[in-house]
């Protein structure tokens, strides 16, 4: 959110479109919404601790059985605050591991949008199933079949696949 700093989110946690931390990556939303969605570095340990604390608050107030982590698919080249290139799929695995360590009894899943990061997500060994959100260029049965086979391979034949379906 535009005002995330007021809640304790640090500038150093964001994902940036250049190596000079001058342009935060974001998903632009209409001006009628509270804010656009800003992306953070999923491998940043301070961000992981911060969001895990927010999950603590949610779990203490609501009887949720788990957490669905979301992403936006491939974002092109992104950088951390110090100018190092991010490896988002590797960051996803780190984030998943941190969330599972914090709440080992809770279920966990992460959306592999367009199968981006699916290998690292399924290969983390910490999600309950493979979850894929496919788009228009992946609308054929052959695409679904390919994703199921790939996910089966990524998870060493241990996880089933669920697809997001929008009507």
Predicted regions mapped to residue ranges:
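Glycan-recognition surfaces
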Residues: 8, 13-29, 102-167
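Active-site-adjacent "subsite" loops/lids of carbohydrate-active enzymes
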Residues: 1-62
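Active-site neighborhood of glycoside hydrolase catalytic domains
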Residues: 43-129, 135-145
């Amino acid at each position: 959110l535009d005002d995330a700093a007021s809640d304790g989110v640090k500038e150093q946690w964001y994902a940036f479109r250049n190596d000079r931390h001058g342009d935060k990556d974001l998903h632009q939303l209409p001006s009628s919404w509270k804010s656009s969605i800003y992306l953070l570095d999923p491998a940043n340990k301070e961000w992981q601790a911060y969001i895990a604390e927010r999950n603590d608050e949610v779990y203490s107030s609501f009887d949720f059985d788990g957490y669905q982590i979301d992403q936006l698919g491939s974002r092109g080249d992104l950088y951390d605050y110090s100018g190092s290139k991010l490896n988002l799929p590797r960051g996803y695995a780190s984030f998943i591991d941190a969330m599972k360590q914090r709440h080992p009894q809770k279920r966990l899943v992460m959306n592999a949008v367009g199968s981006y990061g699916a290998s690292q997500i399924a290969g983390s060994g910490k999600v309950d199933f493979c979850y894929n959100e496919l788009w228009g260029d992946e609308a054929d049965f052959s695409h679904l079949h390919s994703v199921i086979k790939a996910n089966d391979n990524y998870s060493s034949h241990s996880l089933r696949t669920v697809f997001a379906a929008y009507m």
